Every structure is written in C-alpha cells, then in structure tokens.
Regions:
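Loop/turn elements at helix/coil->beta-strand transitions in domains of secreted/extracellular proteins
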Residues: 198-201, 253-259, 289, 309-312, ...
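Surface-exposed substrate-engagement region within the catalytic domains
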Residues: 293-406
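Short, aromatic/basic amphipathic alpha-helical patches
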Residues: 274-286, 326-332, 426-433
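Active-site beta-strand/loop microenvironment that shapes enzyme catalytic pockets
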Residues: 199-209
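Cleavable N-terminal signal peptides of Sec/SRP-targeted secreted and luminal proteins
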Residues: 3-20
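Catalytic cores of phosphodiester-bond-cleaving enzymes
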Residues: 230-290
Length: 445
C-alpha cells in the first residue's frame, strides 16, 4: 500500500488542488437583478438593475459608469458593514447595452477576441484608496483565450456555465407588461446569442411539435413552422432562429465549443417517433457542418480541436434511440433536478449531487446541476407575487458562493435562471483554468 500512498501525496502536492478548498477569485463583482419595478413616474418598467457584490473583508465598494482608472467619481459608494448580506442593489439599469468589440448579432465583423467591459465597474476601497476594480463584461472567446490552460480537460472535467430553458426569454429589448404576465414561463432576459457572448456554453432547449394548421407546398416551411421551443407544455418561440444564432456565434467565435442540449420533447412527440426524424433533418440542415462527431467517450478539448477542426457544437439529444442512428448526435445530458421550493432544500440537494461519486463518474458522461427552484402548487394558484424572477433572485445571490467556495472541483455543468444575477460564468471559467493548470502540473511530474 505504501507506493499508492506516495502517488496520492505526490498528486496533491503537484497539482495543488485540495478537496473543499475555496477558489481564489477577485473579492468584488457585479451582477444584474432578475427583478423589475414600476417607477414613481412614467409607464416603462425598470429592470436589469446593477447589483454590487463582495466577500468578507472588503470595507467599501463603489459603482462607476466609466473606467475608474481614468475617472474616480463613483455614482454609488457604500460601507459594506451596512449590508451584511454582501450585496447592494443600485437603481442603475444595465438596460440593453451594446455588445462591444463587434459582438452585436448583426455586426458584419470583424469581432475582437478577449473580454470586453460594458458600461459598469465596481471598485473596492481601503483607507480611502481604490484597491481593486472589476467590470461587468462579455466573454465571447474565453475557451480559445485560455486554450493552453483548459485544453487538457475532458468534457466531463470542464466546468460549463449554462442556462436553464435557454430559449425562454422575453420578446423585446425592453420588458413589457405582457412579459410580466408570463410569471412561470420566462426563465432568461437575454437571447441565446447574448447568452453565448456573455460566456454561457451550455444551451438547454425543450422542443415541441405543432402540426401546421394550413397546408403549405414547401416541406421546409412546414417543418420550420411546426418546431417550437417550449417551457414544458407552453410554446415560447420558433426553434429555427435560435439554432441560427448558435450557428452564427460559432462562425464568428472560432475555437469556442457549445453544448446544445435538446433535452426533452414535451409536446407532439410522444408516440410519434417519425417526428424526431423531422427535427433531426432540421438540425442536420442548420448545424451539421459545425457539429462534433460522437466517437464514444468524453475526449479532451484539445482532442476536439485537433481531430474535428470544423466541429464547434456538441448536440446532445434526449432520446437514445435517435442518438444511435446519427454519428453527430451525443447521448443525453443527465440533468439533476431537485424539484425544490426553498433555497435550503436546493442547496442540500445540490450538495448531495456534488458528493455523489457515482453521478460524477466521468465514464457516465455529462451531467448538469440544475440550480433553480421549482414553483409549488400554492405559488402557482394563490401567490400573485411569486414568479421565476423572484425565485431566481433568492437563489442567484447564494449560487455564486456555493460554486466558488465548495463545488467548483466537482461541478460539470451548472445552469441557472436569469444567469446575469449570479457570477457563475466567471467562476466556471476560473475553475476550469485552475483545474486545467493543475492537470498540466501533474503531467509534468
């Protein structure tokens, strides 16, 4: 047994990873509230308000609307001791910012690689001196930017930042009264293109099939009009435009890899297996050229980049019989859904997932921690103030800390509602880099 003990000790010393160790990150960050409010004057709803966040030990934080390294006049400055929860919500709205660096959907190009700050910064003060600065940013090319660090990680070792029901977002650039009525339908406030630009790499879709009401001679049009993105039994938006956003992103962000999970088919597919053929035909037309071939196993990112240079999207499909027929479809992601109505219940459920070594066995494939609450019957029927927005607000304020301090070494895919309300994208990237660098240190032994 002594040689085995020596190897384990050497592995810990060489990688520097210690189980249960908190991930080292900047102690301040910005998030965007999932809530909205009605102004005292005017009819337009106010949403996407900026939140300042910090960890213990930070004395003062401030919000800036321009880079404080050039302009040190904050619009908000507070003492953290007055806000023991570690978060302060401002009245400044992100609104619909320009995705700088050429990352607007309709921008002809070229696009600039790297991270890009939007129009809000947070700074921390100690003894009246500005110590640290962070911005709210987009991270459209984070995988290729950090290729040397993360390339050795397998798909099951990388930490993938994701969204839940990714296609269920609001209909316009501004929040409408109609959107607010969909209290338990809309789960995001960014379209799929923007989710990818911010750094999300796992897109979760549920597809419904609705036979066309009127006959059309074009079979292509009939297929397109029949396939919708659903939230359970409710259809939200057509599928094709979302697939094209994924394709456009992959064409502009070379080197990025996206997990596209067609996870469930809640309407129109049960007992009608030929309809899967229509969906697969559509996927083949829209994404086959950039789809990664499934060759068994869960390879490293470097292997994908080297062996499948055109492949940029891993399409996982929630029907194993369909997967067996197509070399470019991957087995389903194992979503871990707690069906919890309280933050404590969700935390305990996810803690069990993170400690489940059988679940996390890399040979079993990709798995996702679904970090969102489920509304109960009482909420649906008798609580007019309850919504997915309010539930996301209670979870998102905790989720960043859970992942950063306890789960970053165990997690594979982490999804959330209204993802800008947490810092999961940044934590997932930092965790992947730390794990990748540790793997490289071990290889160099």
């Amino acid at each position: 047994m002594e040689p085995v003990i020596a190897v384990v000790c050497c592995l810990v010393l060489s990688t520097g990873l210690v189980d249960g160790q908190s991930l080292e990150m900047e102690p301040i960050w910005l998030t965007v509230s999932s809530l909205y409010r009605t102004p005292i004057q005017g009819a337009a709803l106010i949403d996407r308000e900026i939140q300042l966040n910090w960890v213990e030990g930070v004395e003062e934080v401030a919000l800036f609307t321009s880079d404080p390294t050039f302009n040190q006049t904050p619009v908000v400055r507070i003492k953290t001791e007055d806000y023991p929860e570690g978060m302060y919500q401002s009245s400044y709205s992100l609104a619909r910012p320009t995705l700088v660096g050429g990352w607007e959907l309709d921008h002809p190009g070229p696009q600039e690689s790297g991270d890009h700050c939007l129009n809000f910064w947070i700074g921390s003060y100690r003894n009246d001196t500005l110590e640290q600065v962070e911005c709210l940013k987009i991270r459209p090319t984070w995988m290729s930017d950090n290729r040397l660090s993360i390339g050795g990680l397998s798909l099951t070792s990388l930490v993938w930042p994701g969204t839940h029901n990714s296609g269920c977002y609001r209909r316009g650039d501004t929040l409408s009264q109609r959107d607010t009525l969909a209290r338990f339908v809309l789960t995001q406030d960014q379209d799929v293109w923007s989710q990818l630009v911010y750094g999300v790499r796992y897109i979760d879709l549920r597809v419904g099939f609705y036979p066309p009401k009127r006959w059309n001679s074009s079979e292509q049009i009939r297929h397109e009009s029949s396939l919708w993105i659903n939230h359970d039994l409710i259809k939200v938006r057509p599928l094709v435009p979302v697939l094209r956003e994924v394709r456009q992103f992959l064409e502009k962000a070379e080197g990025e890899i996206v997990l596209l999970d067609l996870h469930r088919f809640p309407v129109g597919f049960s007992g009608r297996h030929p309809r899967h053929n229509r969906l697969v035909e559509l996927l083949e037309r829209e994404l086959r050229e950039v789809a990664v071939e499934y060759r068994g196993g869960w390879p490293s990112l470097d292997t994908l980049w080297q062996n499948d240079p055109r492949g940029r999207v891993i399409i996982t499909y929630g029907d194993n019989e369909v997967v067996k027929k197509h070399s470019w479809l991957w087995p389903p992601v194992r979503q871990q859904w707690g069906n919890q109505q309280t933050v404590t219940g969700l935390e305990e459920f996810l803690e069990c997932c993170m400690n489940d070594t059988e679940l996390r066995d890399s040979r079993r494939g990709l798995w996702a921690a679904m970090a969102q609450l489920t509304p109960g019957q009482m909420d649906l029927l008798f609580n007019p103030k309850a919504s997915l927005r309010t539930m996301a607000n209670t979870v998102n304020s905790k989720l960043t800390g859970w992942l950063r301090d306890r789960w970053w070494q165990q997690a594979n895919i982490v999804t959330s509602d209204f993802f800008l309300g947490n810092n999961v994208v940044d934590v997932a990237i930092a965790a992947s880099m730390e794990k990748g660098n540790a793997f490289k240190r071990y290889e160099l032994m």
